[in-house]
Design a protein with these regions (language model features):
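Long, charge-rich, low-complexity alpha-helical segments
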Residues: 1-265, 276, 423, 474
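A generic secondary-structure signal for well-formed alpha-helical elements
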Residues: 188, 302, 306-310, 422, ...
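N-terminal amphipathic, basic helical "cap/leader" segment at the start of enzyme domains
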Residues: 205-207, 212-381, 479-487
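Small-aliphatic-rich amphipathic alpha-helix that forms the alpha element of a beta-alpha
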Residues: 298, 332, 386, 392-394, ...
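Conserved hydrophobic/aromatic beta-strand scaffold that supports enzyme active sites
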Residues: 346-348, 385, 454-458
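A mid-sequence, solvent-exposed acidic-amphipathic segment
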Residues: 361-411
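Short proline/glycine-enriched turn/loop segments at secondary-structure junctions
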Residues: 442-449
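C-terminal helix-cap and adjacent tail motif
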Residues: 453-487
């Protein structure tokens, strides 16, 4: 049965890709994907033939009825109706809508759909989460809220997208355009006016790119291990893996202090002490700035390379913080403003050699911009701003669908490592929530598609008289109440 009664549109039905079948010893027949299975009971001979037809290629409803009727007689007609209804409801069928023999669009299910509505969508507009892009097969309309993707075959469908509120304005007859609009609304690619995307917090709080990133970097509707997701090593035999060491900068190098780890094991505060004493400190001691020796110890304890192994041509390393697949794509760039024993400027931390190499002088416009971007300090920028970048190819050569999410997880564990080490050393740490990626690119000259700025961490000397912690500041603000208006 067509979703919208129309004498001009014809549906072609087929099983969605990557669907498998299995029969249990008791005769129950199952359809399954990697993450979902459904029993179809014990299908008749005609139903089995219909399933084979659907797995082979697209068929019209009438063609499938004829196949079932030939084997099962009148019972086959009733049986195929039940079977197709179950397959539709379970999201097993992709549905191609045709007009005068030409394919308009295909609904490609990702999960079971909601029941189709026979009501017309009121003043529809394109969902703010919908995205039209090109893939290997053509144009694809997607949304993280949709139960299906919509494959666009005919350019006339695009004219309907541009005139959803006026079906007669597009390149298709109004009756056909209504079918396209119905499918867009059913798939949540289009929404009525007014719509919950603007009025409900649960939807309004998500920006399109954030919801897209969340939905596509987690397993679920699109992501299945081995199917363009996970550690697939997709680039093997196509591109060379990136080396563990990045291309060095041309500036002068400065060897850093190496602490005695054996002594630190004896004298450092306990893990519990560090975790309980950890706090964000934004006010530095400008009279007694951080020293080059302290920065050297900090970087050694947080981010040095502890060793490298090569496996099947890929270099894997080890650092004090964990990293997925031992890829260690993160690089640290200390931007020094005020540190005893160091000239102001942007440096790259060469973790394999434990040394700094000058990238740009502190007077460079991009370095100044980087230092002053979104810094939540009442008394100016920190003494050292640790800019963290990601050589994304270290991860993306192996992983699909999830590598940038891994980058952010790695930033998180590096932040915690930095907080703990700074606390143990008596320094003032502050993880920042935002930074200027373009300024990093301008300062370093790196290609942002190969290495991009992803995080910033402020590090300074700790003041003798420490400011109140965040909870104390918020509590004091609450007791004071809102600011009074000036009469």
């Amino acid at each position: 049965m067509s979703l919208v009664t129309s004498a001009t549109c014809v549906e072609l039905l087929a099983l969605r890709p990557r669907v498998y079948s299995a029969t249990r010893p008791n005769g129950d027949f199952y359809l399954a994907t990697q993450r979902h299975a459904e029993s179809l009971g014990r299908p008749s001979a005609g139903a089995h033939t219909v399933l084979r037809c659907l797995a082979d290629r697209e068929h019209t409803h009438d063609e499938l009825v004829a196949v079932a009727e030939e084997q099962d007689g009148d019972l086959g007609v009733e049986g195929v109706a039940r079977l197709l209804g179950q397959l539709r409801a379970g999201g097993w069928l992709k549905i191609t809508v045709t007009y005068q023999g030409r394919a308009l669009h295909t609904l490609e299910p990702l999960r079971p759909p909601p029941p189709p509505s026979q009501e017309v969508c009121s003043a529809p507009v394109l969902s703010r989460f919908a995205l039209l892009r090109r893939d290997d097969e053509g144009l694809l309309l997607e949304s993280p809220r949709a139960w299906c993707d919509i494959r666009v075959h005919d350019p006339a469908v695009l004219s309907v997208l541009g005139s959803l509120a006026d079906p007669e304005a597009g390149a298709l007859p109004a009756e056909v355009a209504h079918r396209v609009i119905h499918d867009l609304c059913w798939a949540r690619m289009a929404v009525p006016t007014p719509n919950t995307e603007d009025t409900e917090l649960r939807l309004r709080q998500w920006s399109p790119h954030e919801l897209w990133f969340h939905e596509r970097s987690r397993m679920g509707t699109h992501a299945e291990f081995g199917n363009n997701y996970g550690g697939t090593f997709w680039a093997r035999d196509r591109f060379d893996p990136l080396p563990a060491r990045p291309e060095p900068f041309a500036g002068p190098a400065l060897d850093l202090y190496r602490p005695d780890l054996a002594a630190l094991r004896r004298t450092d505060p306990t893990l519990t002490t560090v975790l309980e004493d950890r706090r964000t400190i934004r006010v530095p001691d400008e009279d007694n700035p951080i020293t080059a020796e302290q920065l050297g110890e900090f970087l050694y304890r947080c981010a040095r390379n502890r060793g490298t192994v090569v496996d099947e041509g890929v270099e894997y390393t080890s650092r004090p913080y964990p990293s997925g697949g031992s890829t260690y794509e993160l690089e640290v760039y200390p931007l020094v403003r005020h540190a005893a024993g160091l000239q102001p400027g942007l440096y790259h931390y060469e973790s394999h050699e434990h040394r700094l190499r000058l990238v740009r002088a502190g007077s460079h416009p991009a370095v100044r911009r980087l230092l002053n971007s979104n810094v939540p300090f009442e008394q100016g920028p920190p003494q050292v701003l640790l800019v963290v970048s990601a050589r994304v190819g270290r991860l993306m050569w192996k992983y699909e669908g999830m590598p940038y999410a891994l980058v952010l997880k790695h930033v998180g564990v590096l932040y915690q490592t930095m907080y703990c080490v700074a606390t143990a050393m008596g320094l003032a740490p502050c993880g920042l929530g935002a930074g200027d990626a373009e300024a990093f690119t301008q300062a370093t000259g790196r290609d942002p598609l190969e290495e991009c700025g992803v995080a910033e961490f402020a590090l300074s000397s700790r003041p003798i008289e420490e400011p109140p912690n965040e909870l104390a500041r918020l509590s004091a603000r609450t007791r004071q109440g809102p600011p009074k208006e000036t009469p």
